[in-house]
C-alpha cells in the first residue's frame, strides 16, 4: 500500500503560510515597512493603488542587498535578523521569522530592485506566484524597492473576501500610522492613487504625532516622562476634555514596536479615574522601553501582543506616571462636563432661603389724568419707604402712615374701575373650570380626531428604569426599548432623506470648524455627497479641517462633532459590511449617535411620540442593528405568572 502522507511543494506550502501572514493589503504594507526600517533607512516611501489591491510599493534608502541575498530573501525561513533561538530574547529588529517575503511572493506578482552603496550595479528580480520570472542587473539608486501587484491573483476566494476599498484603505492607513509613529526619526511619505496623503519629515515624537493626527492635536497633548530600572516611559496623553467615543487614537509602542495590551490600557483608564464622562476614551501615544530579555514577542502571528515578565509592576508605574502628569499640568477632576460654572450658587448664599418676590400694582394710577393728579398720587405714596412695598399692613411710622392715607383718598376711583368686572371675583374657581367655554372647546377638539386616534392618545405609557416604555394594548401590554426604538425611527428618517427626499438644513450663524487627521479627512471627502443629502452643508474643503455652515434640522449644533466622530469610528473599525451601501452605513451611524440613550428620562408626551413613531415605521420589530425593539406580553401570560 502506497504512503498517503507526502511533502507539499514549496509554492503550495508558501500559499498556505500566506494565509497566516498575509490577510489583506495592510499585512503586506506592515511587513514591507518593517523590513525598510530594519534596513536602517532614513527615507521610506509608500505607494498604493486601489487600497493596495492593485499595487503596494515600498521604496527605501536602506543598506540594500547583494545579489545572493536578493535571491535568498524569497526562500522560506531565510532571515538576517537571528542566527539561533536565543536571539529571540534579545531582538532589536521588527522581523525575524523569515516568512513574509516568501508568503507575499506566493500570492502576488512581485518585483524587487535593490543595490548596496558600494556596488556599481543593483539587482532586479521579478517573481509571480513563487516562480522566478527574471533576474538581471540594473542601474539603481542605493536602497531597496518592493512592488507587490495583483494581490491574491491565484487565490480568487481570498480576494473575494476582501472588504471595500474604503475599509481596506483604512487598514493600510492604520499600519502606516503605527510604523510612522514608532519611528519619528525617519522621513515617511505616503501616496494613494497618485495623491500625496502624508509627507512626514524626521522630527520628535510631538511633531510626528501632530503631523499624523492634525494641527489641533498639539494643544491636547500632556507629556508623560518616567524613567525606572525596569521601564522607561515617554509619550503623551490627551486632556480629558478631548476624550472621544472611540479608541482610534490609542497607541502603545514597546521597544519601537506597536502592540495591543488590554492590561496596559486598563492602567491608563485607571489613571483617568474620575476625569472622564461615561463611555469616553482618552487618546494616548505612549512609548515604552524595556530590556528585550524581559518580553516575549513571538506569541502572535502579527507580533502585536507581548508577554511581560512583571506586568503588575509595569501597570503600577504606568498608572502612577500618567496620574502624575495629569496633576502636574493642572488637569483637575471634573465630574460633570456639561455643567455651566456660571450657574453655581455663591458660597455665602447657599444657606439662605429664597424669598418669594412680591408684586404690587397701584390701582389708583390713571395714565389719562393730568400730571398734577399723578404727582399727587406719587407724593401721597412716598415717604420713608416705597409706596409699592407691602409694609405688612401693620408697619408704624410716618412713612407707612402717609402711604396708606394717600391710597385712602382715592378709594372711589379704584372701586369704579373694579366695577367693570363685577361678579368675576366672586365666582368659584371650580365654576370657571366647568364653564360652557371649556365644554365647547373640548367638543371642538375631539371632533378634530377620529375615534382610533382618541383611543390611542388615551392609553397611558410608563417609563421603567429610564430604559423601557410600557403601554397597555388590547391583548395585554407592550414593552418598548426606548434606545432601539429611537434608533429605528431615526434610521428610517435619515434613509428616506438620502434616497427619496432632500432633507431640510438649518444654517449656522457661526460655521463649525472641525479638525481631523489626513485619513479622516479623506473619509469625510468620500462621505460628503451622502452627508449633504441628510442636511449637512460643507464649505470649501481644507487640508486638515472641515467647515460646516449647515446641519440637519433634527441635530443640534453640539451634536455635530459627535455624529461625525461616530461615523468615522464605524468606518474605521470596519463595521459596515461590503453588502451595505454608504447611505445605509451613514443612516445607521447617525441613528446610533442621536438616539435617546438608556438612562434618559422621558416625559409622557415624549413616550407617546416614541411609541407612535416606532409603530409608524416600515419595520418596527427590529432596530437597524437587527435587535428587537419591543416585546408583547398577553394577559394570558400574566395570568400564568399568577397561576390563575
UniProtKB/Swiss-Prot annotation:
Q: Name one GO molecular function term.
A: mismatched DNA binding
Gene symbol here is mutL
**Entry annotated with the keyword Isomerase:** no
The record ties this protein, via NCBIfam families, to:
mutl
Under the heading SMART domains, the entry gives:
DNA_mis_repair, MutL_C
Per UniProt, the keywords (alphabetical) are: DNA damage, DNA repair
User: Which portions of the sequence form the region Disordered?
Assistant: 363-405
Role description: This protein is involved in the repair of mismatches in DNA. It is required for dam-dependent methyl-directed DNA mismatch repair. May act as a 'molecular matchmaker', a protein that promotes the formation of a stable complex between two or more DNA-binding proteins in an ATP-dependent manner without itself being part of a final effector complex.
**Record carries keyword Ion transport:** no
Single Gene Ontology BP annotation: mismatch repair
Report the InterPro entries cross-referenced here: DNA_mismatch_repair_CS, DNA_mismatch_repair_MutL, DNA_mismatch_S5_2-like, HATPase_C_sf, MutL/Mlh/PMS, MutL/Mlh/Pms-like, MutL_C, MutL_C_dimsub
Superkingdom assignment:
Bacteria
The family this protein is said to belong to: Belongs to the DNA mismatch repair MutL/HexB family.
Q: Which Gene3D superfamilies does this one have?
A: 3.30.230.10, Histidine kinase-like ATPase, C-terminal domain, MutL, C-terminal domain, dimerisation subdomain, MutL, C-terminal domain, regulatory subdomain
In the UniProt record, which is one GO cellular component term?
mismatch repair complex
What protein am I looking at? Answer: DNA mismatch repair protein MutL
Amino acid at each position: 500500500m502506497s504512503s498517503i502522507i507526502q511533502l507539499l511543494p514549496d509554492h503550495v506550502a508558501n500559499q498556505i503560510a500566506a494565509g497566516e501572514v498575509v490577510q489583506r493589503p495592510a499585512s503586506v504594507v506592515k511587513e514591507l515597512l518593517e523590513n525598510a526600517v530594519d534596513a536602517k533607512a532614513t527615507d521610506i516611501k509608500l505607494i498604493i493603488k486601489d487600497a493596495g489591491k492593485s499595487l503596494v510599493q515600498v521604496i527605501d534608502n536602506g543598506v540594500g542587498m547583494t545579489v545572493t541575498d536578493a535571491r535568498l530573501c524569497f526562500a522560506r525561513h531565510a532571515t538576517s535578523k537571528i542566527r539561533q533561538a536565543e536571539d529571540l530574547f534579545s531582538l532589536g529588529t521588527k522581523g525575524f521569522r523569515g516568512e513574509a517575503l516568501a508568503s507575499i511572493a506566493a500570492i502576488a506578482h512581485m518585483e524587487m530592485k535593490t543595490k548596496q552603496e558600494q556596488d556599481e550595479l543593483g539587482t532586479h528580480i521579478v517573481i509571480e506566484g513563487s516562480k522566478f520570472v527574471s533576474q538581471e542587473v540594473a542601474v539603481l539608486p542605493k536602497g531597496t524597492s518592493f512592488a507587490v501587484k495583483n494581490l491574491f491573483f491565484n487565490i480568487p476566494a481570498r480576494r473575494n473576501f476582501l472588504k471595500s476599498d474604503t475599509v481596506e484603505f483604512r487598514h493600510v492607513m492604520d499600519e502606516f500610522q503605527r510604523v510612522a509613529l514608532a519611528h519619528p526619526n525617519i522621513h515617511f511619505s505616503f501616496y494613494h492613487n497618485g495623491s500625496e496623503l502624508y509627507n512626514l519629515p524626521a522630527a520628535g515624537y510631538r511633531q510626528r504625532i501632530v503631523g499624523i493626527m492634525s494641527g489641533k492635536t498639539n494643544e491636547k497633548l500632556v507629556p508623560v516622562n518616567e524613567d525606572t530600572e525596569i521601564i522607561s516611559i515617554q509619550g503623551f496623553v490627551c486632556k480629558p476634555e478631548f476624550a472621544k467615543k472611540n479608541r482610534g487614537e490609542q497607541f502603545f509602542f514597546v521597544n519601537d514596536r506597536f502592540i495591543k495590551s488590554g492590561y496596559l490600557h486598563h492602567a491608563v483608564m485607571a489613571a483617568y479615574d474620575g476625569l472622564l464622562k461615561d463611555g469616553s476614551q482618552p487618546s494616548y501615544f505612549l512609548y515604552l522601553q524595556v530590556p528585550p530579555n524581559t518580553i516575549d514577542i513571538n506569541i502572535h502571528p502579527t507580533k502585536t501582543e507581548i508577554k511581560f515578565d512583571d506586568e503588575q509592576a509595569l501597570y503600577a508605574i504606568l498608572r502612577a506616571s500618567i496620574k502624575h502628569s495629569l496633576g502636574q499640568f493642572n488637569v483637575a477632576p471634573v465630574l460633570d462636563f456639561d455643567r455651566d460654572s456660571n450657574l453655581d450658587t455663591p458660597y455665602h448664599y447657599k444657606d439662605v432661603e429664597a424669598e418669594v418676590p412680591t408684586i404690587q400694582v397701584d390701582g389708583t394710577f390713571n395714565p389719562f389724568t393730568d400730571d398734577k393728579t399723578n404727582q399727587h398720587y406719587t407724593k401721597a405714596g412716598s415717604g420713608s419707604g416705597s409706596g409699592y412695598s407691602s409694609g405688612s399692613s401693620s408697619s408704624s411710622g410716618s412713612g407707612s402712615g402717609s402711604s396708606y392715607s394717600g391710597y385712602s383718598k382715592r378709594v372711589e376711583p379704584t372701586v369704579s374701575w373694579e366695577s367693570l368686572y363685577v361678579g368675576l371675583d366672586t365666582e368659584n374657581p371650580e365654576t370657571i373650570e366647568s364653564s360652557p367655554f371649556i365644554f365647547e372647546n373640548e367638543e371642538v377638539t375631539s371632533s378634530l380626531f377620529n375615534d382610533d386616534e382618541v383611543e390611542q392618545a388615551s392609553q397611558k405609557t410608563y417609563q421603567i428604569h429610564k430604559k423601557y416604555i410600557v403601554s397597555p394594548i388590547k391583548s395585554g401590554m407592550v414593552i418598548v426599548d426606548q434606545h432601539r426604538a429611537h434608533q429605528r425611527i431615526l434610521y428610517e428618517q435619515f434613509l428616506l432623506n438620502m434616497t427619496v427626499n432632500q432633507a431640510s438644513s438649518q444654517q449656522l450663524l457661526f460655521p463649525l470648524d472641525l479638525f481631523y487627521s489626513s485619513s479622516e479627512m479623506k473619509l469625510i471627502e468620500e462621505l460628503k455627497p451622502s452627508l449633504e443629502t441628510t442636511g449637512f452643508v460643507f464649505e470649501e474643503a481644507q487640508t486638515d479641517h472641515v467647515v460646516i455652515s449647515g446641519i440637519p434640522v433634527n441635530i443640534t449644533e453640539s451634536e455635530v462633532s459627535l455624529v461625525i466622530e461616530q461615523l468615522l469610528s464605524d468606518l474605521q473599525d470596519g463595521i459596515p459590511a461590503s453588502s451595505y451601501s454608504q447611505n445605509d452605513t451613514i443612516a445607521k451611524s447617525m441613528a446610533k449617535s442621536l438616539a435617546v440613550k438608556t438612562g434618559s428620562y422621558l416625559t409622557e408626551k415624549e413616550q407617546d411620540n416614541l411609541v407612535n413613531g416606532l409603530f409608524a415605521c416600515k419595520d418596527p420589530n427590529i432596530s437597524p442593528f437587527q435587535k428587537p425593539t419591543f416585546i408583547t406580553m398577553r394577559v394570558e401570560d400574566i395570568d400564568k405568572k399568577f397561576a390563575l
